[in-house]
Amino acid sequence: MKTWSHVALLACLSIKWLTCVMADSIYCDDPDMCSMTKRFLRFGRALDTTDPFIRLRRQFYRIGRGGYQPYQDKRFLRFGRSEQPDVDDYLRDVVLQSEEPLYRKRRSTEAGGQSEEMTHRTARSAPEPAAENREIMKRETGAEDLDEEKRFMRFGRGDEEAEKRFMRFGKSFMRFGRDMSDVDKRFMRFGKRFMRFGREPGTDKRFMRFGREPGADKRFMRFGKSFDGEEENDDDLYYNESDADSNDDVDKRFMRFGKSAEEKRFMRFGKSEDASRDKKEFLRIGKRESRSAEVENNIQIAAKQS
């Protein structure tokens, strides 16, 4: 095989270089697409010249009116006119920037005369000033509406101020604070009767209360012994009438089982009435205050036999 000469090698290299240059000038005429750092296909406006995403021309996938310039800053799938100037905008600018712009004379309101004031042809007349003394319709606001007692979230416009209670701030219901003089301020309040936890002899602490206070009326959800300050006829939540009528143990009220007036406390099982009933004392709550002599003797006999 005959070797190539230096001229042939130089010609091959020149042809290859020329081919690369022509291909680069034909295929990659857009510098945005020819950038090596822009690799991925991206839609929208580029944030920077070094944006690493390849972008198509803005003419693709566009719906709307085309512009005068071949390359416009229009995004994809936009409706309406572009932000770039159109043909009409160019013509308007050329006319307005001419050496002898067209002017027109404004007609005078006086008869037989014409104003000499020159105005631009595209200028608009000055808007008429609005009437300063125009009456403005306002909503009716009486003197009674300015009362401090008529506050937020009130319903109705009745004359009775005391009946407007619900969903009001500063009135009876849904109020927070302490006011011993107002009896109607009860529900959902802190420091009053319902849903109260604490000890205060001077107030009526009734529902959902835990503790011991001789001077207060502690009724519901109460477990324990009675005090001297409580009423004996208070028979709330008794299971039978015999417990309510018995005077031996007044405060044994809730969750009691049995019909005997004797000392049967909580969660006891059995119905026998003989002397061995004291042995059936499982799941009982509380302590006995007094025991009969017969029960004491039975306990002593059982202790000696054991």
Swiss-Prot record:
Positions annotated as propeptide: 36-37, 46-56, 66-73, 108-149, 158-163, 171-172, 179-184, 200-204, 213-217, 226-251, 260-263, 272-278, 289-306
Annotated GO CC locations: extracellular region
Phenylalanine amide modifications at: F43, F79, F155, F169, F176, F190, F197, F210, F223, F257, F269
Region span, Disordered: 104-133
Chief location bin: secreted
GO biological process: neuropeptide signaling pathway
Keywords: Amidation, Cleavage on pair of basic residues, Neuropeptide, Repeat, Secreted, Signal
Isoleucine amide carried by residues: I63, I285
Pfam family, one: FARP
Subcellular localization(s) per the UniProt record: Secreted
Entry comment describing in which tissues the protein is expressed: Expressed in 280 cells of the CNS including the EGP heart excitatory motoneurons.
Taxonomic superkingdom: Eukaryota
Signal peptide: 1-35
UniProt keyword Translocase present: no
Function: FMRFamide induces contractions in visceral and somatic musculature as well as in the heart. May play a role as cotransmitters or modulators in a number of significant neuronal systems.
Similarity field: Belongs to the FARP (FMRFamide related peptide) family.
Protein name: FMRFamide neuropeptides
Organism (species): Lymnaea stagnalis (Great pond snail)
Taxonomy of the source species: Eukaryota, Metazoa, Spiralia, Lophotrochozoa, Mollusca
